[in-house]
Amino acid sequence: MDWIKKIALVSALAGVVCVVASCRISMGLAPISSIDCSKVKTITIAEFPNRAEYVYAPMTTEFNQKLKDMFIQQTRLQLVNANGDLEIDGEITGYNQYNEAVAADGFSSKVKLTMTVNVRYVNNTNHEEDFEQQFSAFQTYDSSLLLTDVQDDLISKMIKDITEQIFNSTVANW
């Protein structure tokens, strides 16, 4: 009788091993895009100059790099210097701060930092999708802090937001 239990146990374990070995769960981020890969293979992303009244030089470099990285990492498009199937260009048009919330003492307690980018998008395989549009993002910070102390972190967050908006409006069609 013991040998029947042993055979049943070994058979059950072998069955579990076979089921586990035949199942594979794959997790990861798949490229997110709704472009027709049979027609669209390349993208040209021009350098966006900073034409805002207030210029913070590191913002321009970070924005240009993050925008290119977004398309390289999340699509199969090849980045080319000119004449891409898709073309994106534009300029940073706004970088401003505004007093937002007034405290009981009559002074501002929060400051709103905004960034605005004008984008021109051309789809050379389907010109019905071409557009020119402004994208903006903002972050707030406590007015007791100096802008120079929080600027880099806030700019990174705004750039992430704006590059996602641009990506979604161009190739993700959201």
What residue ranges belong to the model's regions?
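Bacterial N-terminal signal peptides that target proteins for export
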Residues: M1-A12
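A structural "domain/chain start" motif
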Residues: D2-W3, V19-Q65, D69, R76, ...
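Bacterial N-terminal signal peptides
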Residues: V10-V20
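Surface-exposed short loop/turn segments
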Residues: P31, Q73-Q78, D85-D130, F138-D149, ...
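Conserved acidic
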Residues: V55, M59, S109, V150, ...
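Compositionally biased, intrinsically disordered linkers/stalks adjacent to structured regions
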Residues: Q151-W174
